[in-house]
């Protein structure tokens, strides 16, 4: 029955039935922490002592017999019985027994618990004993105690006295007790004297002899012996407390005489006193034990005797053991058995024990009890006995010979015939019978025992010339290698030649001989080479067999190893060290196996030495890629050293690699190592104080603000730690989900197999089990891989082939056990595992009955490994049955969908969704999938299903469900887009609109019933034609949203926050599910644990900024400030930090839970997990944590007032952002009344918002008058004031004061640009020097101004400025290299010379970023430009000249390749010189990776110019593909890509998700070049062609009909367009089968398409025909190619283009059922709005492009470039972004425009 169902059933019964009875019954079905806690809670509230005792007895019984219960009880709240339930004597006894077994749970009792304990005697005593808390903290009244309580009290008091010696207050209390207290006083007071008669036997250990009047030294003999072993007041031997001192040393002989004859005293003395551990004492004790067996403690003393091999004591032990063997009585056997665990096991001792046990086993075979005891001993100590196997088998076989001889002699004496075969005579196949007694003794199967030990048996039989063994040729051949091994080990190698084996025979048995020899430590390669040739070559040639044999010996006969297995592996590595592929692919699985399996028997140092040795054979890049599987065994220091990490990003890459390792190490181990590395990087270990948690918080927060790349990487780490469920996730939990993957990638069970053939299934299985291998089941994995490879006919990938090659010849074996058929597959009470098991058995048997035997052979091992493996097999089998027409699987699905509300295991429902995806959605009904998706809250699956259903029928209720799903995944653009679909929004549409606006009060009113015509209330939902299933009831779903977002909850929490203003400790009572409020609770926790209040407030301010200065959070922080201020006012005599120390101390006393130290104690950041918490980065004028972080400032707050001031300013900005002018003015007025003049700046910004520029200037002037020039606020105000004045004088005056403001220089430069270009150029340069954020706009302007200068004086001045700029900021120039390079063609010689110097410096310092881009000028058609480049190249250093020469040679070869006319090409045959050029010290274009080689394959594309795709192999081992193009000018494409990179940088500053898909373009000349190849791209035409062809429709044929007219025209348009019904959306379903990846890909497509539409409109990009727009099948991204038709050139074509961008019916169709509404329109508007805000940057970066003399528009007329720039400006003048987007969309989709487009543009698809 379903576990959750049972648990809920028992929890319900607990409410009405006797809890102990219900619990007893529940334990027979399940063990649940929830039930245990519920029972404990009831027991705490109940007063019935009998029922409590009954419950505790049940606990004790289950603790003994149920391991799971032990673990669950440990984690439960059972300690509440101690702290909240009064105990009696019986319950005390049983609960004490529970604590003895389970251990105490670490808690610090609060005041109320302390008070409870003081009033309940038994609880108090148990707490003291269980928690070892023996501090004197309560003066109990002992006079009222009964006898039992008094004895308990005395025991407790003695423990308290021991822990509180010399405590005067305790001594005074003891004196008041109504009992004999002399012993207690003697313990507490060292100077207290006591009579010897009052001391008990155990009391002598707790007092000094000097305290005792009339003491006898013999009385303290044991105390003296314990004091010899005392450490920290405890005896190391017996564990007694030894508090006394000053004992007199006793004489050894006197002591021996005194204990003579007393075995117990002798054993006590031996265990405590080394002087008496003599052979004589050993003999005495052994004699005494064999005469009169003593208690177990007497035997334990034998462990202290130093028994050495061949020593006197060993001889003594052997003498007694031989005596026992000779008598062999049961008593002697018993004594020997008791001695066995405590005697040192030398080989002779172990063998003697074997003789006793084995002979006893045979002699007393009828005594089953004794036989079982002996067998248990032999089994537990098998490894020890196996260590002396040679002695054992020699003894046994000699005994067999003697026995057989005796039998034969008796037969002869009795006159038997000699011709009769003797019963002792055995053939090879009868050896099992011969060794039957021995195999039974070791509890092994006979044949297996003989087979595993033949290594010893055969050489002994051979050496003894075993008389009753008939030679068997096959037996001899199979086992003679054991004889050879034996001869090697005995050093009798010369005898091997005498046996008569040939060299080939010896060579064949080499593996069988060498592995046992290596295991026995035989490494004489010189000797072995005589028989097997070069040993290392032999190992290399037979590596798979070697590894297999080594593992087989290790698993089956681990006792054969005389040396560490790692030493043997080292020998193997030495043999194959030159072959990295073998080292990793062949060897690593076995290395990994031994790493895990050899955990206990091998020390850590041994492993480390081996790992270092093994890893030394890998190059650094290979190590970083692969050694994350070894890193968990290393410390952080070694990981850093081996990986050669140089930055935080490198560390994060390693951490991500660690967390990505699957199947190799436990996830806990990987996460622990990841945390260790994170602590090393961000925990400031350099301070010398270990890990500093507050520093960690601060470091992560600062880096988070500074770097987007850091946010992405640290977010990835956080996501993976969260997936692992590791506690370490809290370390970086502040990272928003905006920077995390919202869902893990699809599992293998979600992979779509297009054709369910055996080979297709096998390919998935092989990849799955190679990369997710469990070392614990390694052999099973290897067996499955081996068997699965038989079904794969074609080749695998190169990487896969390297890995699986070793399994193509292995011989792993597993005996298949047929599964039993089942009738019923599913019941609603089934667990997921049981469901899968029954489904697998049913479907496998159905397949077996059919004709699909090949599938059966492949899938019959599905139940051998984990659940995921079984699930994949079930999916495959179900698909086969569904395709064969089986209806039982569909019936099962229907039953599951109908039982969703009755407790179905969610994993079963999830399986149905996986099956739906696995079968491409062909068999299961959409309605069933929809119900299951909503039940599981799998909104991505629901969205995919709903859109599929809406495409069939556009029902409003389906749109309602779709709107709910989009709201649930926080895709608010689409939520609002659905509202735009309907002309008249429904109440449901309004509901979601209000929810998006966070107006939950208005949303709730949408759910209220509305009155009907007769006053009767009607439901607000619409179109209720039938009762929908509960999980699809929109009204219920909407109510759930409201329940989670109650305004009442907000109000309640805000009111609760007010309580902390009077009592800060009230923060611990705050609770909320709201992310903002959880953030605030975490802030309070930070404050409560702070050691430096001001530093903590600084961190809190940073956290608040990261959360976007949320309004509710700001209000909560106001309460926090009030709370801190009230505490400071109450303790005004103390400093802030001193007050906090007091606060921290008070909290510790008031906290129940223990605050553990270390990384796992402070969950600083986990409240930032909601994407709603994060907004776009704050504006740069913000004075706060972010600005200080970006500027590198480390100064924080110096007072609480500063924190409060920043808080008020943030509130004002928040109101201003919401246009709440009234409240904004109110807050500003409040701060002005308090003379907080910093608010004047915010007042000025408010004035600007209202259009009151004059008032804004006045406010800013006041700021400038009040604040010093050094303050940040003064600088901000001055910049803003100058910007509002916008005059040359204002900027000049401001710059005379503020000489380091990049923004001010940038603003001023624009003002001077038209009149004073030299001054403007200087200001632009200064803007970049002081703030590199200005470089995107300033650098292009600098070079444009310089190139436009005409007077020589201006040119000379500009040259000086550029020289200064180059010296200070050359590192910023590589991204603008193409813009700078184009100036080399400048007609002015002086300008060109200056540019040449800059180009030279860039080429010299940044060769990898400039050489490839320089080719266009080196091959220029303009002689002067070419000559200038030659001059630049001649000045380069020799190394750079060589590298550039190689780049040029490579480009020439690539040009030759592009010109080839052949249809098929290979490098080796057609371009052998090119293939041999590498390595040439040249980087792959656009990377830092060196080209190490080139692939042989060259792909030729069948188009007009026949471009070729080639592949470079990088030094990092990766492939880099490039397309070589001929007769194609790529210069404009290259410059267009430069612009796209600038746009991407703008997008990144505003949002983390928007981007343009770019690729590298490297022109070599005006007619050739290379383009970076992006794999997986398909053109719109190719995609549509595929789907229309399925319906028999041809795009090409349709287009050909209109070639003559070159366009369709309005008359034919509608007929043609209606024929091509949109199909593009199907491509997303087929390319991205998983619903999550499908939605992500479609969002990527929509967003990238919208962004490129705005870019294309702005740039006047035309020629967007169906083959120039491509789509990535890996991500869904849009990629545009052939970007040379720009600046409105499309309107000048023979058939002018009439649309701003392509928005045909297939394009719109693929946006989803919402069409243009939602994501597309939002992305379009926001991108256009971004362009409007950054038009200066965009136009600046187009200046060099437009004014480049190489392009045709510059050659037409000198005024053309200026007109292009003016047109670009005018495009963005006085625009309303959304209105303009509507106009553009209308133009792009207008039929009248589309019908007039050129037919080759394919406007109809």
UniProtKB/Swiss-Prot annotation:
Keyword ATP-binding: yes
Cellular localization per UniProt: Nucleus
Domain FATC: 1773-1805
Superkingdom of this protein's organism: Eukaryota
Role, per record: Serine/threonine protein kinase which activates checkpoint signaling upon genotoxic stresses such as ionizing radiation (IR), ultraviolet light (UV), or DNA replication stalling, thereby acting as a DNA damage sensor. Recognizes the substrate consensus sequence [ST]-Q. Recruited to DNA lesions in order to initiate the DNA repair by homologous recombination. Phosphorylates histone H2A to form H2AS128ph (gamma-H2A) at sites of DNA damage, also involved in the regulation of DNA damage response mechanism. Required for cell growth and meiotic recombination.
EC number(s) given by UniProt: 2.7.11.1
GO biological process terms, semicolon-separated: chromatin organization; DNA damage checkpoint signaling; DNA repair; meiotic cell cycle; telomere maintenance
FAT domain residues: 928-1420
Region (Activation loop): 1680-1704
Source species: Encephalitozoon cuniculi (strain GB-M1) (Microsporidian parasite)
Name of this chain's protein: Probable serine/threonine-protein kinase MEC1 homolog
